[in-house]
């Protein structure tokens, strides 16, 4: 039987480059070598594309802050990808998860795993994804939006814009939201550039920090409660939701360091919630996925408020982590679909669509 040619792309130009390296090499190790002819492709931080020169079987899972070796630069990316049956873009953040590379695959007419251009770009932008979830009547945290370039612009609910000073943003936020608040770059993942704040001075500093990562900033009211995640998979003609998992962060919130470098951060699978609450979250996860016209794969994150037991949608990730500690493969493993079989399902779905 002829093997399916699979290109696994990882690395990339985003701030999540190192996580993508770990995810990508984890995927390569877990792909069935008898079914697939695997072509690892590494993109460095400058955006140059490389192929591996050693045997796929020798590729080890990279650790954070480790870069791959034994590489050869690809002269013509288009020609190289033309020979592939399917592409697995294990890229997190900008230039990989935001619709840009998906657009390239569409132009080349190549089949690929994951959400298409529109869903990828919308879900990468926290502000615009919130607008869609509002339209779908999915419960979310309260928030305000500002634009930050050489000046600050406040954007109201009707998308009217008003030039505003930093201290006036703080006043607006305090008028509309309660502490604690979270300040987030609109286009960022793995909690990069995200800050939890408890007072006006912290809020000012957090806005300045977020501005380094994006020119559009989201300020959200914090939810005191459980952080619960659900994996979604499009397979066999239907959208399925996994069991839920719970984040037990060693830090105040599930930051980049607590996700990838703090050994005390843990996940609880299944989440410590009732059967009814799990079913509610599973239905909401599928609804959110369909609302953005998702395809293939996503992980949807929620909060359950301690005081009210109410569920709030946090965000949707169209290319979740695939490291050994990542929630997405762990959730499906607990739901009866091991890592290797999960990859089979994702590839099968991509080849059909």
Residue ranges, per PLM feature:
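Glycine-rich phosphate/pyrophosphate-binding beta-alpha loops
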Residues: 93, 191, 247-250, 317-331
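Active-site nucleotide/adenylate-binding loops and adjacent lid/helix of ATP-dependent enzymes
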Residues: 2-10, 14, 22, 77-81, ...
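Conserved metal-phosphate-binding beta-hairpin within the catalytic cores
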Residues: 221, 231-232, 289-322, 332
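Hydrophobic beta-strand scaffold residues
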Residues: 38, 111-112, 140, 181, ...
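ATP-binding N-terminal substructure of ATP-dependent carboxylate-amine bond-forming enzymes
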Residues: 1-118, 122-128, 147-164, 168
């Amino acid at each position: 039987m002829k093997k399916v040619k699979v290109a696994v792309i990882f690395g990339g130009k985003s701030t999540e480059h190192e996580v993508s390296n770990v995810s990508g090499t984890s995927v390569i190790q877990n792909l069935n070598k008898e079914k697939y002819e695997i072509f690892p492709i590494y993109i460095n931080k400058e955006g140059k594309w490389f192929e591996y020169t050693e045997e796929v079987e020798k590729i080890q899972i990279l650790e954070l802050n480790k870069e791959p070796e034994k590489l050869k630069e690809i002269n013509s990316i288009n020609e190289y990808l033309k020979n592939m049956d399917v592409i697995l873009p294990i890229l997190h953040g900008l230039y990989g998860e935001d619709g840009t590379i998906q657009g390239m695959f569409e132009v080349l007419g190549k089949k690929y795993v994951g959400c298409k251009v529109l869903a990828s770009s919308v879900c990468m932008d926290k502000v615009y994804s919130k607008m869609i979830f509002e339209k779908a009547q999915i419960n979310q945290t309260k928030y305000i939006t500002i634009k930050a370039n050489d000046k600050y612009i406040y954007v109201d609910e009707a998308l009217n814009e008003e030039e505003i000073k930093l201290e006036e943003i703080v006043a607006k936020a305090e008028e509309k939201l309660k502490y604690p608040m979270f300040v987030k770059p609109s286009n960022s993942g793995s909690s990069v550039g995200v800050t939890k704040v408890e007072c006006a001075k912290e809020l000012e500093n957090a806005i300045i920090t977020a501005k380094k990562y994006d020119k559009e900033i989201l300020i959200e009211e914090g939810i005191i409660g459980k952080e619960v995640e659900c994996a979604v998979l499009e397979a066999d003609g239907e959208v399925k939701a996994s069991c839920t998992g719970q984040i037990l962060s060693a830090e105040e919130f599930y930051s980049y360091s607590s996700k990838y470098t703090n050994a005390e951060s843990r996940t609880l699978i299944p989440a410590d919630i009732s059967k009814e609450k799990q079913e509610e979250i599973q239905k909401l996860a599928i609804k959110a996925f369909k609302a953005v016209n998702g395809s293939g794969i996503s992980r949807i994150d929620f909060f359950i408020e301690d005081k009210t037991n109410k569920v709030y949608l946090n965000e949707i990730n169209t290319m979740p982590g695939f490291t050994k500690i990542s929630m997405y493969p762990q959730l499906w493993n607990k739901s009866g679909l091991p890592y290797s079989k999960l990859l089979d399902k994702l590839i099968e779905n991509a080849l059909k669509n």
